[in-house]
Swiss-Prot record:
Segments crossing the lipid bilayer: 24-44, 54-74, 83-103, 108-128, 164-184, 376-396, 585-605, 616-636, 656-676, 682-702, 717-737, 857-877
Localisation per UniProt entry: Membrane
Protein name: Uncharacterized protein C26F1.08c
Glycosylated residues, chain numbering: 210, 262, 265, 300, 346, 364, 496, 773, 926, 969
Organism whose genome encodes this protein: Schizosaccharomyces pombe (strain 972 / ATCC 24843)
Record has Nucleotide-binding as a keyword: no
Pfam families for the chain: ALMT, ArAE_2_N
Length: 977
C-alpha cells in the first residue's frame, strides 16, 4: 500500500513537471520559430544580395521592433507602429539626404544639414516617446535615420540601395512575424488573455476568503502574542500582496488588449465591464482580511492582558486598535497636539487589566456566531465558484451553467443581505446583556469588555460587504451571458482605457492648508495683495491718471517688456519642468555628440568601417529617463554585447562558414535566448545578444565585411561601450533625473492625493445633502495605485545609482509604499461606510457632534499634510503632532454621552422630542434604542476604519522620520527626567 501511494505521488509530481515544461515550450514556440525563419532568410545569399548591405538587419528588426506579443491584436499593433516608424524614418532620411546632396553638388558642405536633421529627429522622436508612448514607432524612426544619415555624408548622388536597404528588412521581418503569429499554435486571442487573468484573480479571491475564514478564530493553544501575531501578520500581508498583484495582472491584460483583434465568442470590451466589479470585490476582500487580523489581535490582546501583573515595556500602538485614556479628565481634554513619543509608547494601556474571563467570553462569542460565519462563507465561496464557471464558459467551450442555478444563488445572497440588520441588532443585544448596567447605558463605560463583540461584528460587517459585491458580480455576469455568441466571431475595435479623468477633478483644492492667513487678515491685506497670486503677471495695462507724453510712451513699452518676460518665463518653466522636453534634449545631445565623428571628413570613412552606427544605436537604447535606468540598461547591453560577440566568433570558428552548421547553432541558441528574454528578468541581455551576433556572424558569412570576425567583434564591443559611456555622461550632466528623487516625488504625490481624498470625504460628511461620490474617491485610489506602481519600479533601480550618501533604506521605503497603499484602500472603505449613513444617523452622530468631528478632521488633515511635507521637502517631524487618536476617542465618548442623554431609564424607551433641532420627533413612538443599533454599528465601523487609518498614519510618519535621518525619541522615563 505504501509503495502504491508513493508511486502515485511520484506520478503526480511527474505530471506537474511535464505540464510546467510543456507550458514553457509552447510559450517559446512562436518566438523561436520567428527567429529561426528570419535566420534562414539571411542565410540565403541571392536574397541577401537583393536586400542590400545589411541583410542581418532582418534579425535586428524582428528582435527589437517586432517582438512576439501575448495576443494577436497587440502583435498587429506593434507591427503597425513599426511600419509607420519605418515610413516616417525613410521619408525623413530621404528628404534630408536630398538637401545634403544638393549642397554637396553646389560646392557646399551637406554634413551640417545631416547632423542637424539627425539631432532634430532625435529630439522629436524622444519627446513623442516620453509623452505619448508609441515606443516602437519612435525607436524605429530614429534607428533608421541613424543608419541612413551617417552613411557617406559627402556623396553627391543618392544610390538606389539607400531607399531599399532598410525597407526590405523591415517588411520581411513584419511579414515573418505576422505569419508566425497566425499560423503557429498556440494563437492567443485577447479574450483568452483577459479571461484567463480574470479566472486567476477569482481563484486568488477564493484563496483569501478561505484563509480569512480558517483564521476567523485562532486555536486555544496560540497564546503567544508576539510570535503567533507576527506569523499571522506576515501571512495576511502575503495574501494582500497576492490580491494586489493578481488585480494588477488583470489591469495589464486589459491594457495589452487596447486594440482588439479577437476571434472568439465574446468581445474584450464586454469582459472589460468586469474590471470595476473585480476592483470592488478586491477592495472588500482586503477589508475582510484586515478585519480578520483585527479579530486575531483582539483575541491575543485579551490573553495578553489576562494576568494579574501589569505589563511592562513598550507597547506599539500599531499592534493594537484602541486604548482608553487614564482618567476621565484626560478624556475630556480636547487637545489637538500630543508629543511624538506618544505615537509609540502609550502608558494608558497599562491603566486597566483585562478581565480574567475575557478569554472565555470571546471563545463563547465566537462559538455563538461561528455558524453564521460558516454559512455565509460557504455561500460566498460557492457563488465565487459559480462566477468562475460562468466566466470560463464565456471565454471557452465548456458546459453551460443553467440560469436557474444562477438565480438561486443570487436570491440566497439577497436573503443574506436582508438579514444583516437583524444580526447586527442581535449582536448588540448580546453585548448589552453581558453588561450589568443596561438601563443607564453603562455598557459603553466598559468599552474594553465589549471590544470582542464589536470586533466580531466588524468582521461580520465586512463579510456582508463581500457577499454584496459577489452578488453584484453575479448580476453582471447574468447580463453578460446574453452577450456571448454561440459561434466565434471576429471583433476588431479600439476602446478607451482611461481610468480617471485627471482634469475633471484637478480643481479640488485644499484651501484649509494652502491659505496662510485668515479671512480677517485677507480683508486687511486686500490693497497690498499682488496682481496674480499664481506667480504669473497680469497682461492687462493699468488705468493711468497721468496722460503725459512720456507716460504714453513708457507704459506701453513697460507692458511689452513685461509680456515678453512672461513668455520667456513660460518657456524656461516648461523646459526646466517638463520631463518629456528634458528627455528629448538629452537624446538629441547624446546622438549629436556621437555623430560628430561620422560627419568629419577625416573620420567618416573609418567610422563606416568600424560599424560606428552601433554607438549611436547604443545611445538610443541606453539613454533612458532616469540615471539608474541608464546604468541598468547599460550594464545589460554590455553583457549582451560581450556574450553575443563571443558567441558569434566561436560559432564562426566551429562552423567554418558552412550554412547548415550556422543554422543549427543559431537555432539551438535561440531557445536559450528566447527563454531568458520571455521568462526571466534579464530580458535586456537576451535582446542585445540577439542583435549583436548577426552583424558579426552573418557579415563574415556573406563577405560584407573586409576584416576578420575577431576584430569585428572587438570593434563592435568597443563602439557599443563608447555609446553607453556617452549616454551615462549625458544623462548625468544634462538634466540629471535620479530615481531617488523621482521616488520621493511619487510618494509625495501619493500622500498628497491621500490628503485630497480625505478632505473630499470630510466635505461630503459636513455637507447638508449627505452626498457621497464613490467614483471620485475610487478615482483618487486608482491614481495613488498608479503612482505606487511606478514607485515600486523605481525602488528596484535606486541601488544602480552612484551612492554618495550611504546605503539607501530600501526596506523602509517598501514599508512606506505598503502603508500609503493601505491608506488609499481604507479611505475608500471609509467612504463606502459613510455612504450607508441615513438621515437619522447623520443628525445623531454627525451634526450633534460637529465640534468633535471638526477636531478629528483637523487633526487628521494636519497629520496628512505633515506626512506630505516631510516626504516632499524632507522637513523634520514636529515634536508635537496632531493627536488623531485622542480626537477619535473624544468623539466616541461624546457619542456615548449623547446616548446617555437621549436614553430613558424607565423601560429603555427613546425620549420623544429629545435631542437638538427636534430630530427625535421623526422617530416612531415607543421605539427602543436597541433595534436602532444598526445606526450605532455603522458609527462603530466608521470609527474602526478611522482607527486603522490613524494607525497607518502614525506608522508612516515614523517611517518618514527614519528616512529623513531623524533620531528616535527617547523613552517616557528619560523625557520625564
Amino acid at each position: 500500500m505504501n509503495f502504491h501511494h508513493g508511486w502515485t505521488f511520484h506520478k503526480l509530481r511527474k505530471n506537474e513537471h511535464f505540464l510546467k515544461y510543456s507550458a514553457i515550450f509552447y510559450s517559446l514556440l512562436k518566438p523561436v520559430v520567428a527567429l529561426f525563419a528570419c535566420q534562414c532568410l539571411v542565410l540565403i545569399r541571392p536574397l541577401a544580395r537583393k536586400i542590400g548591405s545589411f541583410p542581418f538587419l532582418i534579425l535586428t528588426f524582428h528582435t527589437l521592433f517586432y517582438p512576439i506579443q501575448n495576443t494577436v491584436g497587440a502583435q498587429f499593433e506593434v507591427i503597425g507602429q513599426s511600419l509607420m516608424g519605418t515610413a516616417v524614418g525613410v521619408t525623413w532620411g530621404i528628404i534630408t539626404k536630398l538637401f545634403a546632396t544638393a549642397a554637396n553638388r553646389n560646392h557646399g558642405d551637406g554634413s551640417p544639414i545631416l547632423a542637424t536633421s539627425l539631432a532634430l529627429a532625435s529630439f522629436i522622436s524622444a519627446y513623442i516617446r516620453s509623452r505619448y508612448g508609441y515606443r516602437f514607432f519612435c525607436i524605429i524612426w530614429i534607428f533608421i535615420d541613424c543608419f541612413l544619415l551617417t552613411r557617406d555624408p559627402f556623396e553627391k548622388t543618392i544610390a538606389k540601395s539607400f531607399y531599399i536597404s532598410l525597407v526590405y528588412p523591415s517588411l520581411i521581418a513584419a511579414g515573418v512575424v505576422s505569419l508566425v503569429t497566425i499560423l503557429v499554435p498556440p494563437m492567443r486571442m485577447a479574450s483568452d488573455l483577459v479571461g484567463q487573468s480574470g479566472l486567476d484573480h477569482l481563484n486568488k479571491i477564493m484563496q483569501s476568503l478561505n484563509f480569512s475564514v480558517e483564521n476567523f478564530f485562532p486555536s486555544d493553544e496560540s497564546v503567544s502574542f508576539s510570535s503567533s501575531s507576527s506569523v499571522i501578520k506576515r501571512m495576511f500581508k502575503e495574501h494582500e500582496s497576492v490580491l494586489r498583484n493578481s488585480m494588477d495582472d488583470f489591469h495589464t491584460a486589459i491594457s495589452s488588449s487596447e486594440i482588439e483583434l479577437n476571434y472568439s465568442n465574446v468581445s474584450v470590451s464586454t469582459l472589460k465591464l468586469l474590471e470595476p466589479k473585480f476592483e470592488r470585490i478586491t477592495l472588500a476582500m482586503s477589508a475582510q482580511l484586515a478585519a480578520s487580523f483585527t479579530l486575531y489581535e483582539t483575541y491575543n490582546f485579551s490573553i495578553y492582558k489576562n494576568q494579574d501583573k501589569e505589563v511592562e515595556g513598550d507597547i506599539r500602538v500599531s499592534e493594537l486598535r484602541f486604548s482608553l485614556p487614564e482618567s476621565t479628565e484626560v478624556q475630556q481634554k480636547r487637545n489637538i497636539f500630543t508629543p511624538q513619543y506618544q505615537l509609540h509608547i502609550n502608558g494608558s494601556l497599562r491603566a486597566k487589566v483585562r478581565p480574567k474571563d475575557s478569554k472565555d467570553r470571546i471563545v463563547n462569542l465566537s462559538n455563538l456566531y461561528f455558524s453564521n460565519v460558516d454559512h455565509m462563507s460557504s455561500l460566498i465561496l460557492g457563488s465565487l465558484k459559480l462566477a468562475h464557471a460562468i466566466m470560463k464558459w464565456l471565454v471557452s467551450d465548456v458546459e453551460h451553467i443553467p440560469d436557474e442555478r444562477l438565480r438561486e444563488c443570487i436570491e440566497s445572497l439577497q436573503e443574506i443581505d436582508s438579514k444583516e440588520e437583524n444580526l447586527m441588532t442581535e449582536i448588540f443585544c448580546t453585548a448589552f446583556k453581558e453588561t450589568k448596567k443596561v438601563n443607564d447605558f453603562g455598557g459603553f463605560e466598559e468599552i474594553e469588555d465589549e471590544e470582542e463583540v464589536l470586533v466580531i461584528a466588524y468582521y461580520l460587517f465586512n463579510l456582508f460587504e463581500v457577499a454584496r459585491e459577489v452578488k453584484n458580480l453575479l448580476l453582471l455576469l447574468e447580463g453578460l451571458k446574453a452577450q456571448r455568441h454561440n459561434k466565434p466571431k471576429l471583433f476588431f475595435r479600439k476602446f478607451n482605457l482611461s481610468l480617471f479623468d485627471k482634469q475633471k477633478y484637478a480643481n479640488y483644492a485644499i484651501s484649509a492648508l494652502l491659505t496662510h492667513f485668515t479671512a480677517g487678515d485677507a480683508d486687511k491685506c486686500d490693497d497690498e495683495a499682488p496682481d496674480d497670486a499664481s506667480g504669473e503677471e497680469d497682461d492687462s495695462p493699468k488705468v493711468l491718471n497721468d496722460q503725459s507724453f512720456f507716460d504714453s510712451v513708457r507704459y506701453p513699452l513697460k507692458f511689452f517688456l513685461r509680456k515678453m518676460r512672461r513668455k520667456c518665463w513660460r518657456v524656461y518653466h516648461f523646459t526646466a519642468r517638463s520631463k518629456d522636453v528634458r528627455y528629448g534634449l538629452k537624446m538629441a545631445i547624446g546622438i549629436g555628440l556621437l555623430s560628430i565623428v561620422a560627419f568629419q571628413k577625416s573620420t567618416a570613412a573609418r567610422y563606416t568601417l568600424w560599424n560606428g552606427q552601433w554607438s549611436l544605436i547604443s545611445t538610443l537604447f541606453v539613454l533612458e529617463v532616469t540615471v539608474s535606468t541608464t546604468l541598468r540598461v547599460g550594464l545589460f547591453r554590455t553583457l549582451g554585447t560581450l556574450s553575443g560577440a563571443v558567441y558569434a566568433y566561436a560559432a564562426w570558428e566551429v562552423s567554418q562558414g558552412w550554412s547548415y552548421a550556422i543554422a543549427t547553432l543559431t537555432f539551438a541558441i535561440s531557445w536559450v535566448s528566447c527563454y531568458v528574454k520571455y521568462n526571466t528578468e534579464y530580458s535586456g541581455i537576451a535582446t542585445v545578444f540577439n542583435i549583436t551576433f548577426p552583424p558579426i556572424l552573418y557579415g563574415s558569412y556573406l563577405k560584407t565585411s573586409t576584416i576578420s570576425p575577431f576584430h569585428l567583434a572587438c570593434i563592435r564591443f568597443i563602439v557599443v561601450n563608447v555609446g553607453i559611456g556617452m549616454a551615462i555622461v549625458v544623462n548625468i550632466v544634462v538634466f540629471p533625473y535620479l530615481a531617488r528623487r523621482v521616488l520621493k516625488y511619487k510618494l509625495g504625490q501619493a500622500s498628497l492625493l491621500s490628503l485630497k481624498q480625505y478632505t473630499t470625504l470630510s466635505d461630503y460628511l459636513l455637507s447638508r445633502n449627505l452626498y457621497t461620490n464613490l467614483t471620485i474617491c475610487e478615482g483618487y485610489k486608482k491614481q495613488i495605485s498608479s503612482l505606487l506602481v511606478t514607485a515600486r519600479k523605481l525602488l528596484q533601480l535606486v541601488n544602480m545609482e552612484f551612492n554618495l550618501k550611504g546605503p539607501f533604506p530600501v526596506g523602509i521605503y517598501n514599508d512606506l509604499i505598503i502603508k500609503l497603499e493601505n491608506l488609499g484602500i481604507r479611505l475608500v472603505v471609509l467612504n463606502r461606510v459613510r455612504s450607508r449613513f441615513g438621515l437619522y444617523l447623520y443628525y445623531d452622530v454627525v451634526k450633534n457632534m460637529i465640534d468633535y468631528r471638526k477636531d478629528l478632521i483637523v487633526s487628521m488633515t494636519l497629520t496628512f499634510y505633515i506626512l506630505y511635507n516631510s516626504i516632499m521637502s524632507k522637513a523634520p517631524i514636529p515634536y508635537f503632532v496632531p493627536s488623531c487618536r485622542q480626537a477619535l476617542w473624544n468623539l466616541r465618548l461624546a457619542i456615548e454621552e449623547e446616548g446617555k442623554r437621549r436614553f430613558v431609564t424607565n423601560g429603555g424607551i427613546l425620549a420623544q422630542g429629545a435631542g437638538s433641532d427636534g430630530v427625535a420627533k421623526d422617530v416612531p413612538e415607543n421605539h427602543s434604542w436597541l433595534p436602532a443599533q444598526k445606526n450605532f454599528f455603522l458609527y462603530y465601523v466608521e470609527c474602526q476604519v478611522i482607527g486603522d487609518i490613524v494607525t497607518d498614519l502614525e506608522y508612516s510618519i515614523s517611517l518618514v522620520r527614519r528616512i529623513n535621518g531623524e533620531k528616535e525619541n527617547e523613552t517616557i522615563g528619560k523625557k520625564m527626567a
